[in-house]
Each structure stands twice: as C-alpha cells, then as structure tokens.
Amino acid sequence: MTQSASLELRRRSFLVWCGGLGLGSGLFPGALWAQSNGSPESITSAMIDSAARLAGLHISAVDREEMVAGINANLAGYEALRKIRIDQNVPPPLYFNPAVPGQTFSNERTPFVRGARSNVRRPQNLEDVAFWPVTDLSQLIESRQVSSQELTRMYLDRIRRYDPVLHCVVTLTEELAMEQAAQADREIAVGNYRGALHGIPWGVKDVIAKRGYRTTWGSEAYREQTLDLDATVVARLEEAGAVLLAKLATGEIARGDRWFDKQTRNPWKTDEGSGGSSAGPASATAAGLVGFSIGTDTTGSILGPSKTCGISGLRPTFGRVSRHGVMPVCWSLDKVGPICRSVEDCAIVFEAIRGPDNLDLAVVDMPFNWDGNRSLENLRVGCLQDAFGDDTDANDTATLESLRNLGVELRPLRLPEHAGMDALQMLLVDEAAAFDELI
C-alpha cells in the first residue's frame, strides 16, 4: 500500500469513529484531522479542544480525554485488522438466497432426456468436426469412431495454430489433457462409458482453480499464483470424464477482455475484442479450439462474449452451481456456467456441474428437468420491451421472429425504474472491496 493510500485509509477510519460519536457531520472531523497532521496516533486533548472551537462545539475535558483514548485505540485496531489477509476463497458467514420469502418451487424430478440423435459419421478429415456440438462429438466417441486422444490432439493443434491471433489461452494443460484422454479411451474400450462429456476436450476460464496449474485471474498481480485445490466445477467435469485442454483468458480481475499485455479476439472479426470477461472461453469455443468451455458471470460476463462471438452461453440462476475455487467478484451475484455451440450442449454441461457440494452454502438442491424433444409451442419467453425498437440490432429482431415462428409465446417485460446504473455503481464498489489488497 502506498503512503498516500494508507493515509487515506486512516482518515476514513477516523471519520467513521467520529461518526459513531455523532460527530460525523459538520466541521469537527475535518478540523481534528488537520490538527493531527494526518497522524491520528498523536491526537491530544488540546487538539480536540481546538477542533471543537473551530466547529463551534464545546467538549468537556473529561469527554476529550475519553475521546483521545477511544480514537487512538480504535485506529490501532483498524490498522491491525487491515494487516489480516483473508483468502479470496473464504466465503462470508452470511450467504444470499434470491428466492422471495414465501415463494415455493416444484421439487418434481424427471429424467434428463437428450434430443433426437442423428447418425453421425467420422469425416475423412477429423478437423471437420472442430465446430461440431457436444451432442455430435459424444456420438463419435461413444461409438468409438474417434478416440478421445485423437480429438484432443486435433484441438491442441488448432490451439497452437490460432491462439497467436486470438490470445484466448493463458496456460495449455497438454500433459494433463493427454493423460485424461488416454484414461477415457481405456474406460470406454471396456464399456465404462460415463456419458455425453466422457472424452470431450474443454477449457476453463482462468478465474477457476485447477490444482498444479496457474490461476492468474488475468492480472499481473497474480500472474504466478497457484491454488492447491480443484474448483468444484473442475472436479465435477473430471468426474464426467471431460478432458481439460487449457486455462482460458479472462479480462483482468474478471473485467473486460484485456489481460497481461494482450486482448482476446473475436474469431469472426479479429480486429475486435471478444467481449468480457469470459473472453477466452467464448473465443475458444467459437473458434473450434475446444468442445465446450466454462465461464463466470457477475454482470454479463457469459452472456456478453457469447453474443459477440455468436455462440450459446448459459448464465444460471444464482445458487445453482458451486463457486468453490472460483475467484469472487460479488458474493451475491457471481455465477458459473457453460459456453457451448448449442443450447442442448449447455444443458448437458449444466447437468454435470449443478447442485450442492457443501462448500458453497448458497447452492440449492433444485431439479433440472430437461427434455430435448419437447416442443416449444406455448413456451412463455419474456423479452425486455424497451430493448427492442427502431435501432435494435437486426440479429436480435430476427431472434424474436424465429421464436414466434416456433410457437413461443413472447411476453413483454419492463425492468423496475430504479434498475440500471445506480445498482451497477453499488456493485462496482463491492467488486473493488473484494480486491482492497491491491489498493
């Protein structure tokens, strides 16, 4: 911490203490701070008396002596607390539940039903499958037309070829990937097929921990950071048999698409950024460098880059996926979710990562009833009425029209009038507080 920053911290703490005495307004706090010359440890009864006179107050000698002891003792305590470092992965003692009091939910659980499958065949050139969705890639692996090792090598080759332009990979986990792919092939060969993600190569946003590899949070301040744990989402995808190819780029401290000295690029328009902060997952998935990826979202960090790069991103409801091992930005808004090349891919990945782990107490045990064959007729979809008008992006308008043609019932919605920048400003303060050690 710089000397000026430390001085400002002490000044704020000092003003807080004065406020607790009912002296937080008016001239008194500022006058007393000036009397102390920025060194609250040296405050004396005479300083308080002078400041009180300037502020038009009378404080008795007995009260002044009590204030001297209280101010100095409290400021020393604030300094001691400041030196205690709480690890970023330590959750607060209170946790947020977005459910409205009295609201009830159905606990009916039905089997996960994948959509109708097409008969996929291995192409002559394996790289032709680079952009295939997981629903098709999984059929190639399950039928043993393609091995996980073949698929993994193909994606690794594409990463080496295209990442120098896209800047979407922070750390390549090649050795781990080949080990996991070989294990998947051995299991599948003896009939131990775990499901649609078995043997599928994927990438994870670099705010999510994987033991043995850097977790940089996209910041020079944490460039060599390693965390001795696997995030719950990583552990669950490994249980599903997925193959981790890379730690993918995040904007610095999960903000934007710039990290270190690079900017992650949109594969379809490489002179532009891919959006943030799940910049790497969106870029890599859209460019066919991974089968799918995992991102995080606090204020649009899954949805924004997914739209920019033209892919499917799912920002789950808060409390559906554990954030254990994930860099916190805002404890009541952070969410972890899939970025894929189809909606059903998102459903498949979400099914694998959702649910309680007894490590993130905000996660609820709620069913996820997916039927990939269900008709969309009579499905109610809300749309923000104010977001569509004469200047609306043509693709957004086309999306609404496509939904109507599928039989979806569109219901116009309006956000509360107080929503917007005021709420965002509060969130930005919360985000800054999460990284006060950098101040």
Language-model features: locations:
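Amidase signature
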Residues: 1-192, 352-439
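A structural signal for well-ordered alpha-helical segments within the folded catalytic domains
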Residues: 135, 149, 231-235, 343-347, ...
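Short, well-ordered beta-strand elements within core beta-sheets of diverse protein domains
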Residues: 136-143, 222-225, 334-341
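Glycine-rich, small-residue loops and helix-cap segments
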Residues: 144, 199, 205, 239, ...
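Alpha-helical scaffold segments in soluble metabolic enzymes
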Residues: 154, 183, 232, 236-239, ...
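Short glycine/serine-rich loop/turn segments
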Residues: 197-336, 384-386, 421
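A generic structural motif
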Residues: 240-242, 342, 407-411
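A short core secondary-structure module
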Residues: 317-368
